[in-house]
UniProtKB/Swiss-Prot annotation:
It comes from Lactococcus lactis subsp. cremoris (strain SK11). The gene is pyrE. Pathway: Pyrimidine metabolism; UMP biosynthesis via de novo pathway; UMP from orotate: step 1/2. Belongs to the purine/pyrimidine phosphoribosyltransferase family. PyrE subfamily. This is Orotate phosphoribosyltransferase. It catalyses: orotidine 5'-phosphate + diphosphate = orotate + 5-phospho-alpha-D-ribose 1-diphosphate. One of its GO terms (molecular function) is magnesium ion binding.
């Protein structure tokens, strides 16, 4: 089994990802979805956590070999980013969703030199808006952002478009397509539910259970 499928299987097993095609979830954006993800759950499982961080380290070495600093997004990207930085023996920083309203007013916390090559760590890619804002904040501070890595992506067209428009490279450990394939192989979903899950990928904006 590929590492991508192995991680997808782990996410299902520990219920970091929940699938409910017949009784969909409502995201904060208002989108009705057959899937809900809380990757913070992975931190509670040492073996899963270790596999994720090791896979992240290998992914970063392969896709962004020039990296000089790892940055996590607040808050979900911080623990993963810190562990990855430790794996790679690199400096770590984190990026707030907005600047502090007191003190120095920092949005990027840590020591990041001008022109330092950075990889930003996020746990989940939904529409991509928040992590691309974090990238912009890091670039305003002088970082040279090589790209973004994440555990999982819903593969939403909106996110794909935003990353393409911004020119920011995205690499993920696993994705929606791999996850529903594993769900099919393991009998996690019925054939009817699988069809609903496939339709969600085809058009998330108009999907209905």
């Amino acid at each position: 089994m590929s590492i991508s499928k192995a991680i997808a299987a782990d996410l299902l097993e520990i219920k970091a990802v929940s699938l409910s095609p017949s009784q969909p979830f409502t995201w904060a954006s208002g989108i009705k979805s057959p899937i809900y993800t809380d990757n913070r759950v992975t931190l509670a499982y040492p073996e899963v956590r270790s596999q994720i961080e090791g896979a992240f380290a290998e992914l970063i070495k392969a896709e962004f070999p020039e990296v000089e600093v790892i940055a996590g997004t607040a808050t979900a990207g911080i623990p993963h980013g810190a562990i990855i930085a430790d794996y790679l023996k690199l400096p770590f920083a984190y990026i707030r969703s907005k600047p502090k309203d007191h003190g120095a007013g920092n949005q990027v916390e840590g020591r990041v030199a001008k022109g330092q090559k950075m990889v930003v760590v996020e746990d989940l890619i939904s529409t991509g808006g928040s992590v691309l804002e974090a990238v912009a904040a890091a670039e305003r501070e002088g970082a040279d952002v090589l790209g973004v890595v994440a555990i999982f992506t819903y593969e939403l067209e909106k996110a794909n478009s935003k990353f393409a428009e911004s020119g920011v490279k995205l690499a993920t450990l696993t994705n929606y397509s791999e996850l529903i394939e594993i769900a099919k192989e393991t009998g996690y979903v019925t054939k009817e539910e699988l069809e609903l899950l496939k339709k969600f990928k085809e058009n998330q904006e108009t999907w209905q259970a």
